[in-house]
């Protein structure tokens, strides 16, 4: 049987499907998630149910968002899970997660995310950060390194700044390719994202911060002065105590927020 066929389902490349099969890894992830009935538990991309089964067993109801119609049908007919699942068939990138919030209950979101959509999905989920208690995701190891990077690290970029603006980022464990069927060509890792109840560096307009980061990191090898000359002058950099000769990856989250807030003040 092809390595792309697991439990009778052929992994679809266009959906970025790699199914988790390592029981030890599964148990460690479920232990990190801490399933409970005090939150709305939400799984993105349940696939063949490697995480779905142990999580659903521990709680009364699990909400899942799955794009693949064949996998949705399997879950709808699952002898054990079907009565515990609330299934949304559709694209998580377009999904309004705020509709899942119940009064007095925040979301706990988790999933073995398709690697081809993981970065845009992170940005989408940050929009709902205030409604989310925790997020646990299996990602390409390189993405986890980007999420958790410090200034000066080559992995530090736009995703880093936005993730660390909204969340505390905690790498949980690394997962080798042989833990999946079919094995991906890259190493994987699990990350915990804890949205801040109160952000350490509040921004006056997060859209300005997002645009500023996009502009700053568009040409990583150039200086801030070069990349941000349309929005900040040398005098304004001096006011902020930021050296405009530095490169974008050398600037902290706090400094990016300070720059964005200055841009907001100028636009007011």
From Swiss-Prot:
Alphabetic keyword roster: Cytoplasm, Methyltransferase, RNA-binding, rRNA processing, S-adenosyl-L-methionine, Transferase
Name the UniProt record assigns to this protein: Ribosomal RNA small subunit methyltransferase A
Annotated organism of origin: Shewanella sp. (strain ANA-3)
Lineage: Bacteria, Pseudomonadati, Pseudomonadota, Gammaproteobacteria, Alteromonadales
Family: Belongs to the class I-like SAM-binding methyltransferase superfamily. rRNA adenine N(6)-methyltransferase family. RsmA subfamily.
Role: Specifically dimethylates two adjacent adenosines (A1518 and A1519) in the loop of a conserved hairpin near the 3'-end of 16S rRNA in the 30S particle. May play a critical role in biogenesis of 30S subunits.
Binding site for S-adenosyl-L-methionine: 18, 20, 45, 66, 91, 112
Broad enzyme group: transferase
GO MF annotation, one: 16S rRNA (adenine(1518)-N(6)/adenine(1519)-N(6))-dimethyltransferase activity
EC assignment: 2.1.1.182
Cytoplasm recorded as keyword: yes
Compartments it resides in: Cytoplasm
HAMAP family, sorted: 16SrRNA_methyltr_A
Keyword rRNA processing: yes
PANTHER family in UniProt: DIMETHYLADENOSINE TRANSFERASE, DIMETHYLADENOSINE TRANSFERASE-RELATED
Pfam families the record matches: RrnaAD
Reaction catalysis annotation: adenosine(1518)/adenosine(1519) in 16S rRNA + 4 S-adenosyl-L-methionine = N(6)-dimethyladenosine(1518)/N(6)-dimethyladenosine(1519) in 16S rRNA + 4 S-adenosyl-L-homocysteine + 4 H(+)
Cellular component aspect of the GO annotation: cytosol
